[in-house]
């Protein structure tokens, strides 16, 4: 009986030591998490974040008021009013609103746009304190486009072979 007791004690001590060693290795190993506000992980070029309206390099807005994005939006979050036809036969929007509360970030609006006017940009930090701040009008969308244009253009160029 003494030999069984001795074997059990040595076995349990060995198991305890190996478990403790494993715990210490993990404790001193490099951390797998990021300290979020100060460190940010990589974002995919196909990430669908905050919406933006883009401009052409000459400063003119890209949206031609075709209303394809409004028609394809499953959440009916987009409202567009087209202005009168211009002398060259094109149209531009008078009103372009997105209700970000309704938006499900599916990306259909971006896929439907024939001129890459509406895009979902790389910004994922757009929390607000009130719901009213999540109703984006044309000016807010154009400001987002101006702010994120370099990253948006890079992401579209990276995704071009797959479109």
Swiss-Prot record:
Keywords: 4Fe-4S, Cell inner membrane, Cell membrane, Iron, Iron-sulfur, Membrane, Metal-binding, NAD, Quinone, Repeat, Translocase, Ubiquinone. Binds 2 [4Fe-4S] clusters per subunit. Residues 53-83, 94-123 form the 4Fe-4S ferredoxin-type domain. [4Fe-4S] cluster 1 binds at residues 63, 66, 69, 113. Its cofactor is [4Fe-4S] cluster. NDH-1 shuttles electrons from NADH, via FMN and iron-sulfur (Fe-S) centers, to quinones in the respiratory chain. The immediate electron acceptor for the enzyme in this species is believed to be ubiquinone. Couples the redox reaction to proton translocation (for every two electrons transferred, four hydrogen ions are translocated across the cytoplasmic membrane), and thus conserves the redox energy in a proton gradient. This is NADH-quinone oxidoreductase subunit I.
